[in-house]
């Protein structure tokens, strides 16, 4: 039997239905919002994975081409590997769901959100969050939700709930919030340098809408039978073993976590753990080693948090609001277009900028339609950055997600195409990592663009904030280490300029965060961001005025649309000839925008002149160096511009009387001519004698007729 709930959100009907499709899944939801339809399913294995002590959760978001009435491209004509948007949306759904599974739940669980119909409004991501949560809520899978997702835009100073794509184009905010009825669990935002107070107000508005949706999901859960959740049996560890381990390692852990160097600290902790396992070996207990590890890591978790909460001290000796030492270098690679090495503590990013032409734009065919990207940021996290040896693979979800966050942070300061007609690619290679590598990418990317003479509006910096919360004891941390990210309760990344926020990303591991704590974290992040910006500007205060000698020079001009065909020539002959002759790249858009690119300035000027000659229109009174194309009895036809001929009448060839045209000019000669007239039919009358010095001597008469 099917059960349905409905709710009006921002003037469109949100409909959640269960019991009609995918009934063999543990939970399934058919969610519709406008004409967008998302099917979300949740399935968990019946038995926990043996030896697993983590949540084996997989979340997949997929867009069916048929949802937008399309057939996939490529040879096989079917959906292939996930697109970047699908990867990012999978992460967007995963992040708020993951903390809401109970401790000790180690059953393999898969959540799939499939877009079956798209009205091209761009709402499928937040519907995916809501539908996935609802699928878990109506299932028997243990889940501490439900949650819901809402998008907020801001146009003309007013907030807009779940804006469509057209509205977002003019919006200074693109914010996605997911949360329970009680608290916010996840934030993902891009903004045009908005104040912290505005960001907080938008998050609070989103949470108010989330509460309404969560209430409807709970209503649907009751309607559909309120399935009892599976019991989660946590592994029992002998209390006397816990006492033994604590006695052996507690002081050693306290000493080890105060070692500032990450590698040395981890080496010491690993040694203590190994010694403890060796001391407490029991051949009759096959789980002994695993239990010792669980107890040990639990003690490490407790000691790190207690040290911060009780002493206000961190593993590297900093206070809660302190930033690690920063060094910035620019121009570190001689042949690249722009480069920077940004180091903060034990985290280091090598950021490199490459400038390209319109040929280098990324063309994307999405459900919402085709579009191009002229700015790209790619983040790489090689294994050596954390002292590991493992095979190199194509970028994973984490790398795609970190790159997208840094790209979103920098995008608001990128100049428009009119100001800077380049395709811009930034690559961030993480050379070492101990937390906040995505934020190092933002800082390094800013410096690399400035080194490449990209006229950015303002420098951007990023900082990762953390939270340690035990009941009423709370500590917010600035510029968190990997250890604090792993053992803390929040990862809150804030990027922006001195004027305001350009990107936010927040993930909570506990039951949520209150607006008060969020406000405190944003204000502390602002102070840290301004400090980082001041360090960056000591290395390079403003974008360079001169580009690298190895970067392409680009000239942009606009021609009349009826001239495009002339520039291209029959079968592309003309444009290919110019490119071959001058060693340049030329791109012509349907709008008449012509882009000429070359590393060599002289070649650029030559190509520019050749294009100008093609598109130039003849002007009355102007003198041209033309080529005689044909001789007739009554005059000569002269090509003054490519493809444009005019007639020099025999009477206009010279000041003296001309008996035969061939006496003065021959085909192929180049002569100066002046335009006398362009008649209604477009015929051009030229004169050669008007460009020649007047004859001297009394009584000399010009030939005036012919």
Where are the predicted features?
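Flexible, glycine/charged-enriched surface loops at secondary-structure junctions
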Residues: 103-109, 144-146, 213-231, 263-264, ...
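Long, basic N-terminal domains or extensions that often function
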Residues: 1-233
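Extended amphipathic alpha-helical scaffolds
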Residues: 1-45, 232-368, 552-566, 574, ...
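Flexible glycine-/small-residue-rich
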Residues: 33, 42-44, 61-63, 113-117, ...
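Glycine-rich, flexible beta-strand/loop modules in the N-terminal catalytic cores of phosphate-handling
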Residues: 25-110, 115-122, 181, 188, ...
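Mobile "lid/hinge" segments at catalytic clefts and subdomain interfaces of large enzymes
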Residues: 140-260, 449-545
């Amino acid at each position: 039997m099917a059960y349905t709930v409905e709710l009006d959100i921002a003037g469109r009907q949100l409909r959640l239905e269960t019991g009609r499709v995918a009934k063999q899944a543990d939970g399934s939801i058919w969610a519709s919002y406008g004409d967008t339809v998302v099917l979300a399913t949740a399935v968990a294995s019946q038995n926990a994975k043996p030896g697993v002590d983590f949540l084996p959760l997989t979340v997949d978001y997929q867009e069916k081409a048929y949802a937008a009435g399309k057939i996939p491209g490529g040879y096989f004509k079917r959906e292939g590997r996930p697109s970047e948007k699908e990867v990012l949306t999978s992460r967007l759904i995963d992040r708020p769901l993951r903390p809401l599974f109970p401790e000790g739940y180690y059953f393999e669980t898969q959540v799939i959100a499939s877009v079956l119909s798209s009205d091209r409004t761009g709402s499928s991501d937040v519907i995916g969050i809501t539908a996935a949560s609802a699928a878990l809520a109506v299932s028997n899978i243990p889940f501490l939700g439900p949650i819901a997702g809402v998008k907020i835009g801001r146009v003309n100073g007013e907030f807009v709930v779940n804006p469509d794509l057209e509205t977002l184009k003019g919006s200074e905010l693109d914010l996605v919030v997911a949360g329970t009825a009680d608290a916010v669990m996840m934030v993902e935002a891009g903004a045009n340098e908005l104040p912290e107070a505005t960001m907080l107000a938008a998050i609070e508005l989103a949470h108010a809408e989330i509460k309404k949706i969560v209430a409807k999901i709970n209503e649907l859960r009751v309607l559909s039978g309120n399935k009892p959740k599976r019991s989660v049996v946590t592994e029992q560890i002998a209390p006397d073993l816990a006492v033994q381990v604590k006695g052996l390692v507690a002081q050693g852990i306290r000493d080890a976590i105060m070692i500032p160097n990450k590698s040395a600290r981890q080496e010491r902790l690993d040694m203590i753990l190994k010694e403890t396992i060796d001391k407490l070996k029991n051949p009759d207990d096959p789980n002994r080693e695993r239990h010792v590890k669980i107890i040990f890591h639990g003690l490490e978790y407790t000691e790190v948090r207690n040290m911060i909460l009780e002493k206000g001290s961190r593993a590297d000796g900093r206070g809660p609001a302190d930033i690690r030492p920063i060094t910035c270098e620019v121009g570190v690679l001689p042949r690249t277009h722009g480069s920077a090495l940004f180091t903060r503590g034990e985290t280091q990013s090598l950021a490199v900028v490459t400038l390209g032409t319109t040929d280098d734009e990324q063309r994307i065919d999405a459900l919402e339609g085709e579009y191009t990207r002229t700015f790209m940021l790619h983040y790489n996290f090689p294994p050596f950055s954390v002292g590991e040896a493992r095979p190199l693979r194509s970028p994973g979800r984490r790398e795609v997600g970190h790159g997208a966050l840094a790209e979103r942070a920098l995008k608001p300061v990128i100049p428009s195409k009119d100001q800077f007609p380049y395709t811009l690619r930034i690559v961030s290679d993480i050379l070492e990592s101990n937390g906040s590598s995505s934020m190092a990418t933002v800082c390094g990317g800013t410096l690399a663009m400035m080194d490449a003479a990209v006229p950015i509006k303002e420098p951007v910096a990023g900082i990762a904030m953390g939270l340690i919360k035990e009941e009423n004891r709370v500590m917010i941390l600035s510029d968190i280490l990997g250890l604090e990210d792993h053992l803390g309760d929040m990862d809150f990344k804030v990027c922006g300029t001195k004027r305001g926020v350009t990107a936010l990303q927040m993930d909570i591991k506990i039951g949520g965060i209150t607006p008060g704590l969020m406000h405190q974290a944003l204000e502390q992040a602002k102070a840290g961001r301004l400090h980082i910006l001041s360090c960056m500007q000591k290395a390079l205060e403003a974008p360079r005025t001169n580009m690298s000698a190895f970067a392409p020079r680009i000239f942009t001009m606009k021609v009349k649309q009826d001239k495009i065909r002339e520039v291209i020539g029959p079968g592309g002959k003309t444009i290919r000839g110019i490119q071959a002759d001058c060693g340049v790249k030329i791109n012509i858009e349907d709008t008449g925008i012509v882009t000429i690119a070359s590393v060599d300035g002289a070649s650029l000027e030559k190509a520019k002149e050749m294009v100008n000659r093609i598109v130039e229109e003849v002007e009355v009174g102007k003198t041209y160096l033309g080529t005689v194309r044909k001789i007739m009895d009554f005059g000569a036809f002269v090509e003054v511009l490519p493809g444009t001929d005019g007639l020099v009448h025999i009477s206009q060839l010279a000041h003296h009387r001309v008996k035969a045209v061939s006496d003065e000019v021959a085909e192929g000669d180049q002569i100066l001519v002046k335009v006398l007239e362009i008649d209604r039919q477009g015929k051009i009358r030229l004169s050669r004698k008007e460009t020649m010095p007047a004859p001297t001597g009394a009584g000399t008469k010009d030939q005036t007729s012919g």
